[in-house]
Regions:
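Active-site environment of divalent metal-dependent phosphoester hydrolases
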Residues: 14-15, 53-56, 85-95, 147-151, ...
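Conserved beta-sheet core of the metallophosphoesterase superfamily
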Residues: 194-274
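Active-site neighborhood of divalent metal-dependent phosphoester/pyrophosphate hydrolases
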Residues: 12, 42-60, 76-92, 194-212
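Metal-dependent catalytic neighborhoods of phosphoester/phosphodiester hydrolases
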Residues: 18, 51-68, 85-104, 110, ...
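N-terminal active-site segment of His-dependent metallophosphoesterases
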Residues: 1-70, 74-78, 407, 411
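Conserved catalytic scaffold of divalent metal-dependent phosphoesterases
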Residues: 104-211
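Active-site neighborhood of phospho(di)ester-bond hydrolases with catalytic His/Asp-centered motifs
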Residues: 8-9, 45-49, 80-87, 107-112, ...
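Accessory, non-catalytic peripheral segments of nucleic-acid enzymes
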Residues: 270-414
Length: 414
């Protein structure tokens, strides 16, 4: 028999984008996803964390989530949904409605449960997956975002985060392997930063771990796992050259650095315990992101480009207007430039999000490199401010700003 599965992650319901809510975008995605689940007669939906954008999501975001679960079940009553918590989610809040959601064939793992003897309850992390005939086809190792202390301790009791998380997946795999029947597949879920995961150069939507101190090697996931469904990184990709270890990516771009990501869900089949028919299913984008101009240009050139944008039509749906980031090349700070941009866009069918200034490099100035973890331990805060100011504005830090910074440092040191 076979099991049809779809993997998604990083919905970030309730996110605001530079002050604009994204309700219509999320609603369009969820409606599309229900159609895909129904059309493909999907047996299992895996949601690999960051359902919500914040730990205390709005009532509207929670309603949207619960309404999706209800509608997905109504269109496909046999659909099984497995959800793990991400670092943006409140694990306890996500688990709170479990008694009700069990009626919708939905399993949620937010926290790592422990037994009365304070050992990890591995059974609670194993979710059986059934085919349309009600036969168990696979076992899912549903591991939520792990924090310090969530993973099994070593005998020495001195673990790095990477060692602890790796031990968690290996021990859980061994336990699940002992519980499965012949022909049953094992698959895993996780919300973490995997070693070698690709990001765009200016991606700041998820915290980049300094020096890779908390990135998990693909070797943590046993090669006999039929599939590993990951969340946390917003760029859809396979990891470590293994087709079966994947980030689904976010359904919406969470920042302008993600505007060229291929937003998708991953569909695949488990056939007699083996992975087959793996396919990336593109998600239609409701609202576009535009950077104008494509490269920073002078204020006059920027304003000329903005004047050529399409006019707004009376009664138009503003939620369909593209988000706009303006890039300008300045020789010195220009406090009035934003006002001129806003005037130029007053009758245009776009939504201004930000104006990003850049400054020409001084002659002989080399490209700056990011500070390493060791650098950050050695550099003084004032030196960091001076370095950042010079890189951003091309000049020395003004004395009045240095004085203000020193005053603040004295206050926080009291």
């Amino acid at each position: 028999m076979s099991l049809k599965i779809i993997h998604t992650a990083d919905w970030h319901l309730g996110q605001t984008f530079f002050g604009y809510d994204r309700d219509e975008e999320h609603e369009a995605f969820l409606s599309w996803l229900i159609d895909i689940l129904t059309l493909r007669q999907t047996d299992v939906l895996l949601i690999a964390g960051d359902v919500f954008d914040v730990a205390n999501p709005s009532a509207a975001a929670q309603r949207r989530f619960f309404r999706f679960l209800r509608e997905a079940n109504r269109h496909n009553p046999q659909l099984q949904i497995v959800i793990i918590a991400g670092n943006h989610d409140s694990a306890a809040r996500l688990e709170a409605p479990i008694p009700l959601l069990e009626e919708l064939n939905t399993s949620i793992v937010g926290v790592v449960p422990r037994t009365d003897l304070c050992k990890i309850d591995f059974d609670s992390l194993l979710i059986p997956l059934y085919n349309k005939e009600g036969k168990r086809e696979a076992i899912c190792l549903a591991v939520p975002y792990l924090r310090q202390g969530d993973y099994p301790a070593s005998k020495e009791g001195k673990d790095t985060y990477v060692e602890g998380v790796t031990r968690m997946y290996r021990q859980l795999y061994d336990y699940a392997d002992s519980q499965r029947q012949p022909g049953e597949a094992l698959l895993a879920m996780g919300h973490l930063h995997a070693t070698g995961a690709e990001l765009s150069e200016d991606d700041r939507s998820e915290r980049t771990i300094m020096g890779g101190l908390e990135s998990i090697s693909v070797e943590a996931f046993n090669e006999d796992l039929a599939y590993t469904a990951l969340g946390h990184i917003h760029k859809a990709q396979r990891v470590g050259g293994r087709e079966s270890v994947r980030y689904a990516g976010s359904p919406l771009p969470m920042s302008f650095s993600e505007q060229h990501y291929h937003h998708q869900v991953v569909a695949f089949t488990l056939e007699n315990g083996c992975l087959s028919d793996l396919e990336a299913v593109p998600i239609p984008l409701r609202t576009a992101l535009h950077r104008i101009p494509a490269e920073p240009a002078s204020p006059a050139e920027v304003l000329l480009s903005l004047s050529n944008l399409p006019l707004a039509e009376e009664g138009a749906d503003r939620s369909l207007w593209p988000y706009l980031e303006v890039q300008v090349l300045l020789t010195e700070p220009d406090p009035g430039f934003r006002h001129r941009v806003e005037e130029a866009l007053a009758d245009k069918a776009v939504r201004l999000t930000s104006i990003i200034p850049s400054y020409p490099k001084k002659e002989g100035e080399e490209d700056s490199r990011p500070f390493s973890y060791t650098d950050l331990q050695k550099i003084a805060p004032l030196d960091m401010l001076r370095h950042t100011f010079t890189n951003r504005f091309g000049g020395d830090l003004p004395e009045e700003l240095e004085k203000m910074f020193n005053d603040v440092m004295r206050e926080v040191s009291l």
